[in-house]
Amino acid sequence: MAFVKLLVSIAITTAITIAVITTITNNTTTIREYTSFDAPSTPTIRPNRLLAQKEVGERNPNAADHCNRNPEICTPYGGGGSNSTMTCCNNKCIDVSSDDNNCGACKNKCKFSQTCCRGQCVYVAYDKRHCGQCNHPCELGEFCVYGLCNYA
């Protein structure tokens, strides 16, 4: 019975609120005496920003550095030297030690639920050397289960 009373009181409150709002809104609106339905004399054309063409000389700052022509472009990104893991893949400088689509070498894609750690595709849920994330080893004698060392 209390639920029915609550439902009726909410319905009455809602009806009163709607009635008050519509009376206030209707009193403040003004009616235009003259409305022109003629076509505008000059059409206004707005350029679409999505399809706006860029100037020929303008360069995209996110564009690749065209490392196919000059592979040495990628070495400054990785710290240089022989320890650099940056490589030119598909005309882009890629860190092959941590990229899941180019793990260890170009176009070497890791399988589903694998992650690229140090250039190798590993299951971080069960690998003792990379438990839960890259370079997080479990202690001696512990197992990695579901990305946690000594789960049980």
UniProtKB/Swiss-Prot annotation:
Q: Does the entry feature the keyword DNA-binding, yes or no?
A: no
| Alphabetical keyword list | Signal
Which InterPro entries would you find in this protein's record? Stig-like (IPR006969)
Would you indicate the residue range of the signal peptide?
Answer: 1-19
Q: Does the keyword Disulfide bond apply?
A: no
Give the similarity note: Belongs to the STIG1 family.
- Protein name per Swiss-Prot or TrEMBL: Stigma-specific STIG1-like protein 1
